[in-house]
């Protein structure tokens, strides 16, 4: 019996090592996102799962494949309260994917959408799936308030509601402080001034407005239909935040999180609704189907540090991802680092010596918005199209997440 068990174990180990030595190359065949809506704005009446379904359906269409070709759907989402069971399953079936499609919902806070891509890439690399849709979504407008004392009845006195957005999305789980407090701490630690953050924010808005004006987002956005009174259908076709900016008010805004802080409503990301998806497949399978991939995933990594230091976690994840990809910082043409706050972009660029002209060239979350479950995938979608449209070779996407973490991904244009 022991001998037989030993043979089985040896066989499994051998199979594991064989798999590891013959990893499939993973490519992005299509990359799509919705416009990003303001909280309470143009997309606020649409459930987040529906927004995700719209991007999945469009990603499948643009990839030139059939819904039945998708083996697995891995979808990021942060605040799942009141969405119903198995949000990723809802997203997949709502997009017309078949009942056989394996579905998984991922919560790594703001890194959820990117971590979904990583899990999808790993599934393909190991030969478990041939085609995976990965992405993320968030309707911050539809996150409920919690009545946590109602399960067994309030015994006496006034009761309060808990904001689900804050509790499960935007507050540190260990000391209860807002994420912006961590942003202020980061600014103090790296000696980044209010003026520098405001300048970064203004630049983010200007870049986003320029990108909208010139149609630079057109290739990545799928329009979202809104059914109004009398069944009249209108379409949301562009990000809602950039054109709401009032530049003259930015220098005079009060600190948002700490009395003497430097993070303000203008140099922080906003509360938003949106979704994004990519179609992943093995490079060999794409070739079999006669498809032309947009990019190859050549490296990825995660990193963690103290929760209060989450804004600079990308500075740990990026070098690890580059090492795994076998390239160095000087070879990277473009960086997309999610702008949870302007200080995140500034601090990570300072630590890693990133040229501002290579960073978030079409603006970032400060200007575009930050639907937290989607943003990790959204910046990969944007980066994929940037590399194509600018005919550049290597790009890095990275995003920090509450709790002290980060995920980073390295792309090579094809």
Swiss-Prot record:
K(+) binds at residues 205, 266, 268, 366. Pfam families: Thiolase_C, Thiolase_N. PROSITE patterns: THIOLASE_1, THIOLASE_2. Its EC number is 2.3.1.9. The active site is at residues 110, 370, 400. GO terms for molecular function: acetyl-CoA C-acetyltransferase activity; metal ion binding. GO terms for cellular component: cytosol; mitochondrion; peroxisome. It catalyses: 2 acetyl-CoA = acetoacetyl-CoA + CoA. GO terms for biological process: ergosterol biosynthetic process; sterol metabolic process. SUPFAM superfamilies: Thiolase-like. It comes from the Eukaryota. CoA binds at residues 205, 244-246, 249, 269. Keywords: Acyltransferase, Metal-binding, Potassium, Transferase. NCBIfam families: AcCoA-C-Actrans (TIGR01930). Belongs to the thiolase-like superfamily. Thiolase family. This is Probable acetyl-CoA acetyltransferase. It comes from Dictyostelium discoideum.
